[in-house]
From Swiss-Prot:
GO MF annotation: an example: RNA binding
Matches recorded under Gene3D superfamilies: 3.30.230.10
Biased composition (Basic residues): 118-137
Pfam families (alphabetical): Ribosomal_S9
Swiss-Prot/TrEMBL keywords: Chloroplast, Plastid, Ribonucleoprotein, Ribosomal protein
Name used for this protein in its record: Small ribosomal subunit protein uS9c
GO biological process, one term: translation
Length: 137
């Protein structure tokens, strides 16, 4: 029986969350492509330069912008939440590549999960905090 050489490519993963969004991120050595749910990142994020800049930010800080392909499975929430979840997932994956990256990413704030979520609506109120108009008489 012949033994086959299987070429293994290093895959680094990280999970990011923001609001209601969850992004499972895989970093693969490559040329800097962003693929979100099987769609190129530029078209998925509606060609918004802000969303793309947020998603690539951890790689840009470390100077690794065109060295890794980013494959993302994002679900829940909207584009803002998903873009921030991708950023957190990429930052966590970069920490698994090299633990020395942690100090740089931590000082930039990319490893901090944003705890702000939508506040629930309370009964007797119109929204979470908006009360109906008060009439004294």
């Amino acid at each position: 029986m012949s033994t086959e050489l299987i070429k293994t490519r290093a895959i680094y993963s990280g999970t990011g969350r923001r609001k209601c969004s969850v992004a499972q991120v895989r970093l693969v050595p490559g040329s800097g492509n962003l693929i979100i749910n099987g769609i190129p990142g530029e078209s998925y994020l509606q060609f918004s330069p802000n969303y793309l800049r947020v998603s690539y930010a951890p790689l840009q800080v470390l100077g690794l912008l065109n060295q890794y392909d980013i494959h993302v499975n994002a679900r829940g929430g909207g584009l803002t939440g998903q873009a921030d979840a991708i950023r957190l997932g990429v930052a966590r994956a970069l920490c698994s590549i090299n633990p020395e990256n942690r100090t740089t990413l931590k000082s930039e704030g990319y490893l901090t999960r944003d705890p702000r979520v939508k506040e629930r609506k309370k009964y007797g109120l119109k929204k979470a905090r908006k009360a109906p108009q008060f009439s004294k008489r």
